[in-house]
Structures are given as C-alpha cells and as structure tokens.
C-alpha cells in the first residue's frame, strides 16, 4: 500500500508532465484513446467522487471559520475568469465552437489540482480546499447561469439541461464521496494516499480522448487556442493575486486565492461541452488544452511564490 501511495503522490505532483505525455501518445495513437470520449461524464464523475472521499467534516468547519477569505475567493472565482473569457473571445474574434469552449472553462469552479499546487507553493491549503468545496457545491447553479448569460450571443444555451449535467457529474459524486467518508472515515483514511490516483487517471483519460478525436483540428487551430488559454489562465492568476493584495490579504492566503482563481475544473468544461453542445465539437478543445497548461503554469507559479522570505517580506510591505 505504501508503494501505491508513493506512486499516487508522484503522479499527482507531476500531473502536468503526465498529461503532456499521454496527450502526445493520444495524438499519434488515436484509436487507442478515442473510445474514452464516450465516457467523459463517467470519468469526471469518478474524479469528483475521489475528491469527495478526501473531504472531511472538519473542512466545512474551516469554511465557516474564515468566511471573509472564502467569500473573496468565491466571488473572484466566478467573476474574474468568466469575464476574462468573454473579453478574450471578443478581442480575438474566436469562432463559435472555440468561444463556447473558452467561456465554459471560465465559468467552471476551481480545479481539484489547485489544492496540490497551493501546497507546493506554500499557500494556505485549508483555504484552498475551502474555496474548492464552496465553488464546486455552487457550480450546479452558478456555472449554467454564467454560461447562459455569456455564451448566449454565440449559441443557444439550455440552462436546465446544464444544471442537470453538473448535478449528475459533480454534485452527486462529490456528496456521495463526502457521505461515505463521513460514515466510514477510518477505513477511507487507510487508503487516503491512493485517492488522488483516481482523479489523476480519470482526468488523463478525458484529455487523451479529446486530443485523439480532435488531432487534425489541433494542427489547424491549436496554437490559437493555446494562446487564448495561456492568457486566460495567467490573467486569472495575476488579477486574483492583485485583488488579494488590494484587500490586504496575507501572503499564504493570497497565494491560495490566486491559484484557485487561475486553475479551473476544465474536466467539467469538457464534460459539459460533450453532453450539451454536440453541434459544437471543438468546444471541448479549450478545456483539454487548459488542463495541460494550468498544471504547468501552476507549478511555475508555485515555485515563484515559494522562492524565499524576501518575496514574502516585499509582499507584506505592499499590503500593509
């Protein structure tokens, strides 16, 4: 079990590299991964179930014990990224499918990998977990509503169909995982080290399938999507960090907020595009590329934030 736990930790730490490797393999060996697109919602549900299994009742206590930071993170999550997505789509004059995909990414809750990145960065992990929980539990209403408002100029959006999709692939699996952890907490604790493995494998399968199916399209518009995705992610982290500074939030908490804002549950964006926008097949592409990029940028950002006390002291001088 210890070896499996170490293997799970290794995969979680280097998920960005692993996603890139499997994406390259899927690009050239398309038949080996194309089948996974039929099970996108299943894989995401499994990943969210794995996340639910890691959430304890104490995590909810932390949420209520620090409402200010949680509220700031929540508002930043669901305003900064959606607005940036809409602005980029307008400025870059993106085709309908790609614009829809970018907006879907922007309107999703924080990604599960953000907690790991916050830990590596020396950020406030408890705050990161609290923000992920609140944004995820609110996603069944907030995400469809934002997509309906922002993407309605490009395509017809069925609000209630999206609500049902998010409930099925996010809310139900997460709540089921929380319930099982609450009832059988001691047993779950024994396998806690391998739980991230569930999410890693699921996300890798989702992205590999999207790459395999859209390999030809990636050649024609991949650089455009990559550029938009990079701007989206970096602007999100930068503005999130800037907002935290303006509000005089402590260094480690600001780090967690910036990471949480910039890193999205892009797997959900892919799932929603697959289930609700069949007529727009390329809408899955921004989510797939975002999944690769935000793990790379998140790791680099984590290294910068953890670089030393001088950075922290300089930050404190600015915020005081």
Segments (PLM) and residue ranges:
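Alpha-helical transmembrane segments of multi-pass small-molecule/ion transporters
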Residues: 1-320
């Amino acid at each position: 079990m210890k070896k499996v736990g170490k293997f799970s930790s290794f995969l979680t730490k280097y998920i960005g590299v692993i996603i890139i490797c499997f994406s390259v393999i899927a690009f050239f060996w398309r038949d080996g991964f194309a089948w996974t697109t039929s099970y996108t919602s299943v894989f995401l549900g499994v990943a969210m179930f794995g996340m639910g299994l890691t959430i304890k009742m104490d995590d909810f206590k932390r949420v209520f014990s620090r409402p200010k930071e949680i509220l700031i993170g929540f508002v930043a999550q669901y305003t900064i990224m959606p607005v940036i997505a809409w602005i980029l789509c307008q400025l870059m004059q993106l085709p309908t499918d790609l614009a829809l995909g970018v907006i879907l990414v922007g309107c999703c809750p924080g990604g599960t990998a953000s907690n790991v990145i916050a830990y590596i960065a020396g950020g406030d992990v408890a705050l990161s977990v609290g923000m992920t929980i609140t944004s995820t539990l609110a996603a069944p209403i907030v995400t469809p509503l934002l997509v309906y408002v922002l993407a309605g100029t490009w395509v017809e959006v069925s609000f209630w169909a999206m609500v049902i999709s998010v409930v099925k692939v996010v809310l139900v699996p997460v709540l089921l995982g929380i319930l099982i952890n609450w009832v059988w907490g001691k047993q779950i604790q024994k396998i806690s080290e391998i739980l991230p493995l569930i999410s890693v494998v699921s996300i890798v399968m989702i992205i590999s399938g999207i790459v395999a199916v859209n390999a030809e399209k990636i050649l024609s518009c991949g650089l455009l999507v990559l550029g938009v995705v990079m701007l989206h992610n970096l602007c999100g982290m930068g503005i999130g960090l800037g907002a935290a500074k303006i509000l005089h939030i402590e260094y480690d908490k600001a780090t967690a907020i910036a990471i949480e804002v910039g890193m999205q549950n892009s797997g959900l964006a892919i799932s929603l595009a697959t289930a609700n926008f069949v007529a727009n097949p390329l809408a899955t592409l921004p989510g797939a590329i975002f999944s690769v990029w935000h793990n790379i940028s998140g790791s680099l950002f984590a290294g910068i934030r953890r670089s030393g006390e001088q950075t922290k002291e300089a930050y404190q001088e600015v915020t005081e």
